[in-house]
UniProtKB/Swiss-Prot annotation:
Gene3D superfamilies: Glycogen Phosphorylase B (3.40.50.2000). Condensation of UDP-2,3-diacylglucosamine and 2,3-diacylglucosamine-1-phosphate to form lipid A disaccharide, a precursor of lipid A, a phosphorylated glycolipid that anchors the lipopolysaccharide to the outer membrane of the cell. It comes from Pseudomonas entomophila (strain L48). InterPro entries: Glyco_trans_19 (IPR003835). This is Lipid-A-disaccharide synthase. Pfam families: LpxB. GO terms for biological process: lipid A biosynthetic process. HAMAP family: LpxB. The keyword Ligase does not apply. GO terms for molecular function: lipid-A-disaccharide synthase activity; phospholipid binding.
Length: 375
């Protein structure tokens, strides 16, 4: 079996998780493989030496990207040149579509097979991107079933592989065990999850803490857990906690334990909403963007929903409070009833979980290697 050279680029922590699982599955099928590209600590643990720190790609929001645009364009140009020189057997762009789709197009034009893992939200906004995907991508791997249907209609080769989180998160989690691990007493527990990026926590952190203070009046004996993505986020939240009296436990990472332990979640829109859904925890979703970013997106977005549970259910299964509607009072009043009974949400969560549970990393590896069998 000839050595394979697989290039991957991931732009943030969720992509690092997906990339490492895919790398592991490819190695199991084709042990003689070399990995190059850009990834985080999990991908590096699977054998990649990252060309530069993955964190340099982790920016969100139209306005926020502008401040880093020159660096991002320079890194992308250098990466394309390096990969054309290396001539990998396949390039796999993991999420980060504004960065990776252009790389895929240039590499495919240079005769390199290209795969995009995790569909951008083309079904929701900037639908013309599907033309670039069709031109630059030999195969699209989607995590969600409605995405695959969209690509089939657009004539893009696609495979729905399922979601790795649906594979790793159990269909039923042990709330009592998670509470014991985190040292949480009996009684209602709410997880606060204002996001993993600095900008998100800056816009939502204090708002969520204000909502928590109101929730203390609405839910007797409630306690809170807030998982911090890294030391910088923890420092950010600690600063916001000064002068507040909240029964709150800050965690370093451990977001899955927080979800397993809690009764309900106040959560930023993003991948974490999928995790909360897979843990069958009722939630209220909130989001605030820079005003200009929000104004632009409001005019571009075609989807009536922003959160993954609602997109998967194709209905307003979980409340979404966005921008000016996301006040501390509204968040608290909407979440409080769910602490006692969130079954209207959680019954549907179980059904969706089973649909997404398909052994994604192995499905994705099989699809990539099938693409290469004629090389």
């Amino acid at each position: 079996m000839a050595q394979l050279c697989v290039a991957l680029v991931a732009g943030e922590a969720s992509g690092d998780i997906l990339g490492s699982g895919l790398m592991r599955a490819i190695k199991a099928r084709h042990p003689d493989v070399r990995f190059i590209g850009v990834g985080g600590p999990l991908m590096e643990a699977e054998g990649m030496s990252s060309y530069f720190p993955m964190e340099r790609l982790a920016v969100m929001g139209l306005v926020e990207v502008l401040g880093r645009l020159r660096e991002l364009l320079k890194r992308r140009k250098e990466l394309i040149a390096t990969l054309i020189d290396e001539k990998p057997d396949v390039f796999i762009g993991i999420d980060a579509p504004d960065f990776t789709l252009n790389i895929e197009l240039k590499l495919r034009q240079a005769g390199i097979k290209t795969v995009h893992y995790v569909s951008p939200s083309v079904w929701a906004w900037r639908q013309k991107r599907v033309l670039k995907i069709r031109e630059g991508c030999d195969l699209m791997l989607t995590l969600l079933p409605f995405e695959a249907r969209f690509y089939e209609e657009q004539g893009v080769p696609v495979r729905f592989v399922g979601h790795p989180l649906a594979d790793t998160i159990p269909l039923e989690s042990d709330r009592g065990a998670a509470r014991a691990e985190l040292g949480l007493a009996e009684g209602p527990v709410i997880a606060l999850m204002p996001g993993s990026r600095g900008g998100e926590v800056g816009r939502l952190g204090a708002l969520f803490l204000d909502a928590a203070q109101r929730l203390r009046e609405l839910v007797p004996g409630v306690r809170f857990v807030l998982p911090c993505a890294n030391a910088a986020r923890r420092a950010q939240v600690e600063q916001m906690l000064e002068g507040r009296d909240l029964p709150l436990t800050l965690l370093d990472g451990r977001s899955h334990q927080a979800l397993a332990a809690c009764d309900a979640v106040l959560i930023a829109s993003g991948t974490a909403t999928l995790e909360a859904m897979l843990y069958k925890r009722p939630m209220v979703v909130a989001y605030r963007l820079a005003p200009l970013t929000y104004w632009i997106l409001k005019r571009m977005v075609k989807s009536p929903y922003v959160s993954l549970p609602n997109l998967l259910a194709q209905r307003m299964l979980v409340p979404e409070l966005l921008q000016d509607a996301a006040t501390s009072e509204a968040l608290a009043q909407t979440l409080a009833p769910l602490v006692g009974d969130g079954s209207q949400q959680t019954d549907s969560f179980d059904q969706i979980h089973r649909t997404l549970r398909r052994d994604a990393s192995n499905q994705a590896a099989d699809a990539v290697l099938a693409l290469l069998k004629d090389r």
